[in-house]
Amino acid sequence: MATRSCREKAQKLNEQHQLILSKLLREEDNKYCADCEAKGPRWASWNIGVFICIRCAGIHRNLGVHISRVKSVNLDQWTPEQIQCMQDMGNTKARLLYEANLPENFRRPQTDQAVEFFIRDKYEKKKYYDKNAIAITNKEKEKKKDEKKREKEPEKPAKPLTTEKLPKKEEQQLEPKKSTSPKNAAEPTIDLLGLDGPAEAPVTNGNPATAPALSDDLDIFGPMISNPLPAAVMPPAQGTASVPAPATLSTVTSGDLDLFTEQTTKSEEVAKKQLSKDSILSLYGTGAQQSTPGVFMGPTNIPFTSQAPTAFQGFPSMGVPVPAAPGLIGNMMGQNTGMMVGMPMHNGFMGNAQTGVMPLPQNVVGPQGGMVGQMGAPQSKFGLPQAQQPQWNLSQMNQQMAAMNLSSANASAGFGQPPSTTAGWSGSSSGQTLSTQLWK
């Protein structure tokens, strides 16, 4: 379909061009050949703009395409440009241009060779060419070009108007984007991880000593005898000072539970730096020592041996003396102040008294008296003996201390008790008064 339509269009154009050429041939000058003046020319040199006969057409072809381009009026197809050139020039104008200097008595040649020489002199050598006419023709050509430009100029401004409107619209669309972009940049960036939040301000409760104390409380393996607390971190006595519990708890929850801080490691390093030879030796000095009150009697400072007695064959030797709390077991401290604590008792109690300073000789347990008083007595719900609380005074303590010194000469391999007392693990404790009124 497309080829047919193209062919039809081409035919219509060709017909139109033939009509134009036929009109041009009807002119008086165009009825004759431009070179030999033969009648009825059917060929034309469209670049020169002249109608010629068939013989002159052959000579024009021999000149070359750069000089003359020949076409048949009826057999060839013409283009609009070629038709325009023929309309502009014609035989009359061509003679005025190419034969301006031709002599008046000049006869046109009739033979082929003479015609060829004349055609070469006329179009190739431009022997008779009017130079002034060239300027006229150039001016006419310039005028025609100007007219064509003027005809195209009103059409051209219409196109830039559309192109100018589009950039304006694009600029209007870009302006709101530019105005919105600073707003997005001005918004503060929010850290989603929350590590740099406003909660970075340190919480201070006014107690600078709580940090090392709390780090030590979190230590599972300390403080022990091999790793004692420094003097600056020693807890105060129970009866002398009272620390408010809510304040310490708040510091624990606020500071030590923070997984991203290094307070525990820093406090441990501070505590280790404070440990020195003097601070460790000061723990074993003869100064005032802390005493924990017993269950049945007041706190006392009692010396113990540095080694376990070797005469006790039924009990293993202990490397470190652990003092027993006085009064935990009824009448335990009657006269046996030098006993070793840590022996397994059937009621589950172990001693917890403070260590003393005065050493005792080995194989010495104490004067004759009950090692563990009233062990055979019926026990209470919590494993405590139902014996009455002994009443101690300073005189009895002095007597017992003197008895401890005398007992070194009477030491024996056994428990050092008469048969009446060793059999039942119960003995009379001198200087003790048992009364049931204290329990009321």
Swiss-Prot record:
TM segment ranges: none
Biased composition range(s): Basic and acidic residues: 140-158, 165-178
CDD domains listed in its UniProt record: ArfGap_SMAP
Zinc finger (C4-type) boundaries: 33-56
Identification of the protein by name: Stromal membrane-associated protein 1
Ranges annotated as biased composition (Low complexity): 420-440
Localization terms from the record: Cell membrane
Membrane-related topology note: Peripheral membrane protein
Organism: Mus musculus
Pfam family, one: ArfGap
Gene behind the chain: Smap1
Keyword Hydrolase (UniProt): no
GO CC terms in record: cytoplasm; plasma membrane
GO terms assigned for molecular function: clathrin binding; GTPase activator activity; zinc ion binding
Role according to the record: GTPase activating protein that acts on ARF6. Plays a role in clathrin-dependent endocytosis. May play a role in erythropoiesis.
Tissue expression remark: Detected in adult brain, lung, heart, liver, ovary and bone marrow. Detected in stromal cells of the red pulp of adult spleen.
Annotated motif Interaction with clathrin heavy chains, positions: 192-196
Record's subunit section: Interacts with ARF6. Interacts with clathrin heavy chains via the clathrin box-like motif.
Gene Ontology biological-process entries: positive regulation of erythrocyte differentiation; regulation of clathrin-dependent endocytosis
Domain Arf-GAP: residue ranges: 18-143
PANTHER family: FI20236P1, STROMAL MEMBRANE-ASSOCIATED PROTEIN 1
Keywords: Cell membrane, GTPase activation, Membrane, Metal-binding, Zinc, Zinc-finger
Residue segments, region Disordered: 140-211, 410-440
First-listed, main subcellular location of the protein, grouped into a coarse class: membrane
InterPro entries documented for this protein: ARF_GTPase-activating, ARFGAP/RecO, ArfGAP_dom, ArfGAP_dom_sf, ArfGAP_SMAP1-like
